[in-house]
Amino acid sequence: MKLKILGSSSAGNCYLLIANSGQTLIIEAGISIKEIKEALNFDLSKVIACIATHRHGDHFKYAAEYMQNGIEVCSGVETLDSIDYSHKMRVIQKQVKHTIGEFVVMAVEVKHDVHCFSFLIQHPESGLILFATDTMYLPYKFPGLNNLILECNYSQEILDSRLSDGETIDMVRNRVIGSHMSLETAKGFLRVNDLTGVNSIVLIHLSDGNSNAALFKTEIENLTAKSVFIADKGMNIEFNKEPF
């Protein structure tokens, strides 16, 4: 299994899980179909679906474009209802296992400022993947994890420092805190979950102004003793159940 990152920021989020067979599951619809085609050598024949967490543009802007190109888009009904185009749509219900090609996907509801899912994704090659973004916190323990794609949007210390220095305002600070996961919260989530079987942790959706990629990577590595990556456009990561 390979994880290919096409975008991981407020400019657009999109990730490809590519199995050894070539079968591809898209996560998030925040990148244009043109870029999807370029990433897959203009061959969409093995794309089985796109799963999307919520309706905000950096995650869902191009959903209709995907559908128009024959890609089924799967999400919660609240998210799918936000666009007019209804062809190639599939409603995902929370805490129900959905088989999508070689993948099995289960959604869990998380805390954001609109209806939002995180996903548990199972595949024989990758094992159990957690994909979690745009959530204030994760009030769950997930047994049997093998790989994590986890939001680490901001540092509380950096955010508070910028507020003190007049670089941001209370309204923005409060919106960030109420809708995104901090480094401190991500660390708390990792502490209470069993990471014995985890190979890789990919930190996603880092804020341009309120994060520090090198610091975040070091802190999570020191906490977990796992391979930690900071998501960047164009990055390819081996995403297997076994480390080698």
Mark where each language-model region is.
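Conserved beta-strand hairpin/beta-sheet module of binuclear metal-dependent hydrolase folds
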Residues: M1-L40, F117-T133, N146-N147, Q156
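Active-site metal-binding loops of divalent metal-dependent hydrolases
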Residues: G7-S8, A29-I31, R55, E78, ...
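Short, hydrophobic beta-strand segments that form beta-sheet elements in well-ordered domains
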Residues: I27-E28, C50-A52, G70-V77, M89-I92, ...
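Active-site metal-binding motif and surrounding structural segment of the metallo-beta-lactamase
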Residues: S32-S75
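Active-site environment of divalent metal-dependent phosphoester hydrolases
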Residues: H56-K61, D81-S82, D113-H115, L138-Y140, ...
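Active-site regions of enzymes building and remodeling cell-envelope glycoconjugates
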Residues: G70-E72, Y85-Q95, E102-V105, L145-L150, ...
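Cap/insert and terminal regions of metallo-dependent hydrolase folds
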Residues: P143-G234
